[in-house]
Curated annotation (Swiss-Prot):
Disulphide-bonded residues: 69-75
Function: Antimicrobial peptide.
Annotated signal sequence range: 1-22
Protein name: Lividin-3
Organism annotation: Odorrana livida
Pfam families on file: Antimicrobial_2 (PF08023), FSAP_sig_propep (PF03032)
InterPro entries: Antimicrobial_frog_2, Frog_antimicrobial_propeptide
Propeptide: 23-40
Gene Ontology annotations of biological process type: defense response to Gram-negative bacterium; defense response to Gram-positive bacterium
Length: 75
């Protein structure tokens, strides 16, 4: 059982190294100045996500403020 685990771990490790080398080679082939379509999508989605998180935080803060006001009867 232990030898099976060792061999599977070795195959996983070698596959990971092979995959990372392929990715590095592919990245080296692409132009450095150009943004790929995936990078553009990631940046747009990241911006939208940040905006939604900010809006959610402000909405939650206003709800919590209103609740604390109602609970303490200090409105």
């Amino acid at each position: 059982m232990f030898t099976l685990k060792k061999s599977l771990l070795l195959l996983f490790f070698l596959g990971t190294i092979s995959l990372s080398l392929c990715e590095e080679e592919r990245d080296a082939d692409e132009d450095e100045g150009e943004m790929t379509e995936e990078e553009v999508k990631r940046s747009v989605l990241g911006t939208v996500k940040d905006l939604l998180i900010g809006a959610g935080k402000s909405a939650a803060q206003s709800v919590l403020t209103a609740l604390s006001c109602k609970l303490s009867n200090s409105c």
